Amino acid sequence: MTIIVTGAAGFIGSNLVKGLNERGETNVIAVDNLTRADKFHNLVDCEISDYLDKQDFLARFARGEFGKVRAVFHEGACSDTMETDGRYMMENNYRYTLSLMESCLEQGTQFLYASSAATYGASQVFREDREFERPLNVYGYSKFLFDQIVRRRLPSALSQIVGFRYFNVYGPRETHKGRMASVAFHNFNQFRADGTVKLFGEYGGYGPGMQSRDFISVEDVVKVNLFFFDHPEKSGIFNLGTGRAQPFNDIAATVVNTLREAEGKPPLSLDDLVQEGLVEYVKFPDALRGKYQCFTQSDVSKLRGAGYSERFLSVEEGVARYCRWLLERNG
């Protein structure tokens, strides 16, 4: 039976296609916008049955041209939190997603889509409740508004609708994202280019490099998506993080020590890395004051309550694995 992945040439989308392939699923239609042509690299080692541009796909799917479709993984969106064109953002992230969901409901197709932790904005609590949702930008609002529609539709929906509020995802196939790529990716490139990783100094009551995020490996993101794919009776909106915040220091130390290991050098403690100038702290930029979250940590109790019980990779495990993957491909 056919499976459709939108945003298939993107970061999470291409990892999902690869994850489906590893389970023997090759009847996968990839949907994307290859205006950024270099994204095609993410699909070179994937098996797909067809490729469609996002503009052609929506109407054809609504007409039922692809026959019985088991599931749509909707990862396609504008994920640039700095985008200021609100009309574009709402059309791309909200209206397109709404039309796609309606078609899935009409056809009895599982609909699994990407929401975002940006729906929480400045909140200090990251739980899937309306009272904690305070998006700070139009990207977060586009995701928030669609989640609100989903909540209205869930009681009457006859097929699965699942939204995943991704926290800070890192891992293979994100090179094309540029400045929006993960901290791990940027730390890796910075250290290889300059021999040091620079982190923010003290800010917001947090010591140098101690501002923390819920960093999750794309490997775990794929596993959770496929868990719900296997359980079409489960619907809802779920946080998708590890449930554990880790400081940027952990990312930097793991990146540097993994690269040192590749050169046959022993690992160093954070203090030693700082002492040797391999990790440096810079003054917190004035432009970010009052606009920067110093701490995020997903509440994954709802996800666990839905039956997902696998352990998530820590930064030390996942980032090290990712750095080795980057080394294999970049030499």
Swiss-Prot record:
It catalyses: ADP-D-glycero-beta-D-manno-heptose = ADP-L-glycero-beta-D-manno-heptose. GO terms for molecular function: ADP-glyceromanno-heptose 6-epimerase activity; NADP binding. It is an enzyme of class 5 (isomerase). GO terms for biological process: ADP-L-glycero-beta-D-manno-heptose biosynthetic process; carbohydrate metabolic process. NADP(+) binds at residues 11-12, 32-33, 39, 54, 75-79, 92, 143, 169, 177. Pathway: Nucleotide-sugar biosynthesis; ADP-L-glycero-beta-D-manno-heptose biosynthesis; ADP-L-glycero-beta-D-manno-heptose from D-glycero-beta-D-manno-heptose 7-phosphate: step 4/4. InterPro entries: Epimerase_deHydtase, Heptose_epim, NAD(P)-bd_dom_sf. CDD domains: ADP_GME_SDR_e (cd05248). SUPFAM superfamilies: NAD(P)-binding Rossmann-fold domains (SSF51735). Homopentamer. HAMAP family: Heptose_epimerase. Contains a large N-terminal NADP-binding domain, and a smaller C-terminal substrate-binding domain. Catalyzes the interconversion between ADP-D-glycero-beta-D-manno-heptose and ADP-L-glycero-beta-D-manno-heptose via an epimerization at carbon 6 of the heptose. This is ADP-L-glycero-D-manno-heptose-6-epimerase. The gene is hldD.
